[in-house]
Amino acid sequence: MMDLELPPPGLQSQQDMDLIDILWRQDIDLGVSREVFDFSQRQKDYELEKQKKLEKERQEQLQKEQEKAFFAQLQLDEETGEFLPIQPAQHIQTDTSGSVSYSQVAHIPKQDALYFEDCMQLLAETFPFVDDHEVSSPTFQSLALDIPSHVESSVFTTPDQAQSLDSSLETAMTDLSSIQQDMEQVWQELFSIPELQCLNTENKQQAETTTVPSPEATLTEMDSNYHFYSSIPSLEKEVDSCSPHFLHGFEDSFSSILSTDDASQLNSLDSNPTLNTDFGDEFYSAFLAEPSGGGSMPSSAAISQSLSELLGGPIEGCDLSLCKAFNQKHTEGTVEFNDSDSGISLNTSPSRASPEHSVESSIYGDPPPGFSDSEMEELDSAPGSVKQNGPKAQPTHSSGDTVQPLSPAQGHSAAVHESQCENTTKKEVPVSPGHQKVPFTKDKHSSRLEAHLTRDELRAKALHIPFPVEKIINLPVDDFNEMMSKEQFNEAQLALIRDIRRRGKNKVAAQNCRKRKLENIVELEQDLGHLKDEREKLLREKGENDRNLHLLKRKLSTLYLEVFSMLRDEDGKPYSPSEYSLQQTRDGNVFLVPKSKKPDTKKN
């Protein structure tokens, strides 16, 4: 045996390389890349993906460790569910000497940016809130403890005690100044935070309106400030027994706000007996006491109780109609204010929000749907005629028709109030807000005639065109040219006449077009109805013909069977229907034709 030497697997011959290149070019033409057949390239890609996966896992593990270390420095807030940084315990150094004690602020290193929660905690630790019944500063407590009880009076003060008192006061003043500096520094640090910039403006406004009291004033007013909250009930008790001068102070401040016109109106209120006696007496007549001889004022408790009962109950519409202030009969005696939106006054200069505009809208309300655009413009151009025709739509009633309102204190039942509400009639709405009565007009008839003229008629009348608008629109061309040749017109009149005739002809053409469309629609509807009737008629005839045809077929089959049963062969036997059939020719002859191919036939 001859041993064959095989090439090592790592080495490839030139023929194999050429074959690989040929196959690769074919695969390239088919869309396959060379890396599919290259094992080393695939191995490199696999190792690269493996390294990327390991790097990604390492990054995730590092991120988890960082998060774990971060959350270890935080604590969970049970109220908000947020993670807050753990603050170290702040030790407050206090001076226990017999002079003055003050809480020192713990030093906190300044960071680039502070959290809002850190600042609030710093503020709470630096300036702890005290109760209402505690002294506002520890300095005052120590100062009050240092002063003996027998030295409180200036009569028994010795020179040594006075010197010690002066030294303690100087120490307190220096401590207060240092406290103020520390407070200002802390506030500046707080307001340097971006989240608290919105509070800076409020702090400035408060700094402008408030002042810092001096230490001497604080020491002298300490006792009064200490008992301020506890003295509120006594202050409430003294409100009832305050002097009338205190109450007049509010009236003076109110009168200083008003203008001179309003002040004169207020003075007229005091001098007007109708307003003082009639206005609102139905509302609070239950708790207004009669003026006695001693001139005693009703107690504030009774007034507040009656007022709460009045405001607690609902106000009915009938009660408003019974009130003299809401009754139009007493409008002459009431004083009206400028710019009133109460709905009572209709005089003087009202604002845009006043109910006068709603009154005007009700007088000159929306026109009937039959009005055209030209009539609407004509109504807008002639408001005087509309104003004169406005009260015509309102029914007039005599003074005897109105029911005199009665106060509810006289014991009337609810049914009487309802009947009074139904019988209460409306008065005539005035034409303008400044008039209480409808003005008399002499040219009412002519204004009514002008109110019904169209815009073209008004324009033709203004330009003195001698013939009516209907003739301009409806005349034929020859007659219109002849009529125009008889008169002399300027450019404005000619332009108006041409415009009126053009728009009139367009309007007539549009009407004729709509008319033709309607006629075509009606004609189509009629044709559709006729076609439906004819279709129903044909359907009925078809059904009848089908029934007749079915009856004839049945008769024919009966006759066929009868004739076929009468036929006999040579032996006298009847023919089988499965083997023979009858057929008729055009001349009326009937033949017995076998269904199978047989030459013999018989003639009947």
From Swiss-Prot:
UniProtKB keywords: Acetylation, Activator, Cytoplasm, DNA-binding, Glycation, Glycoprotein, Nucleus, Phosphoprotein, Transcription, Transcription regulation, Ubl conjugation
SMART domains: BRLZ (SM00338)
Gene3D superfamilies from the UniProt entry: Transcription factor, Skn-1-like, DNA-binding domain
Pfam families linked: bZIP_Maf (PF03131)
Subcellular localization, as worded in the UniProt entry: Cytoplasm, Cytosol; Nucleus
Region feature Disordered, mapped onto this chain: 334-447, 570-604
Motif ETGE motif: positions: 79-82
Motif (DLG motif): 29-31
Amino acid composition bias (Polar residues), ranges on this chain: 340-352, 395-407, 578-587
Residues that carry a glycan: 461, 471, 486, 498, 568, 573
Region (Leucine-zipper): 521-528
Modified how: Ubiquitinated in the cytoplasm by the BCR(KEAP1) E3 ubiquitin ligase complex leading to its degradation. In response to oxidative stress, electrophile metabolites, such as sulforaphane, modify KEAP1, leading to inhibit activity of the BCR(KEAP1) complex, promoting NFE2L2/NRF2 nuclear accumulation and activity. In response to autophagy, the BCR(KEAP1) complex is inactivated. Phosphorylated by EIF2AK3/PERK following unfolded protein response (UPR), promoting dissociation from its cytoplasmic inhibitor KEAP1, followed by its translocation into the nucleus. Phosphorylation of Ser-40 by PKC in response to oxidative stress dissociates NFE2L2 from its cytoplasmic inhibitor KEAP1, promoting its translocation into the nucleus.
GO CC aspect terms: centrosome; chromatin; ciliary basal body; cytoplasm; cytosol; Golgi apparatus; mediator complex; nucleoplasm
Region (Mediates interaction with CHD6 and is necessary to activate transcription): 590-595
List of residues that carry N6-acetyllysine: 595, 598
Biological process annotations from GO: aflatoxin catabolic process; cell redox homeostasis; cellular response to angiotensin; cellular response to copper ion; cellular response to fluid shear stress; cellular response to glucose starvation; cellular response to hydrogen peroxide; cellular response to hypoxia
Residues bearing the modification Phosphoserine: 40, 214
UniProt main location, coarse: cytoplasm
Region described as Basic motif: spans on this chain: 498-517
Family to which the UniProt record says this protein belongs: Belongs to the bZIP family. CNC subfamily.
Entry's free-text remark on domains: The ETGE motif, and to a lower extent the DLG motif, mediate interaction with KEAP1.
Subunit record text: Heterodimer; heterodimerizes with small Maf proteins. Interacts (via the bZIP domain) with MAFG and MAFK; required for binding to antioxidant response elements (AREs) on DNA. Interacts with KEAP1; the interaction is direct and promotes ubiquitination by the BCR(KEAP1) E3 ubiquitin ligase complex. Forms a ternary complex with PGAM5 and KEAP1. Interacts with EEF1D at heat shock promoter elements (HSE). Interacts via its leucine-zipper domain with the coiled-coil domain of PMF1. Interacts with CHD6; involved in activation of the transcription.
Purpose: Transcription factor that plays a key role in the response to oxidative stress: binds to antioxidant response (ARE) elements present in the promoter region of many cytoprotective genes, such as phase 2 detoxifying enzymes, and promotes their expression, thereby neutralizing reactive electrophiles. In normal conditions, ubiquitinated and degraded in the cytoplasm by the BCR(KEAP1) complex.
Protein name: Nuclear factor erythroid 2-related factor 2
Source taxonomy: Eukaryota, Metazoa, Chordata, Craniata, Vertebrata
Gene (name only): Nfe2l2
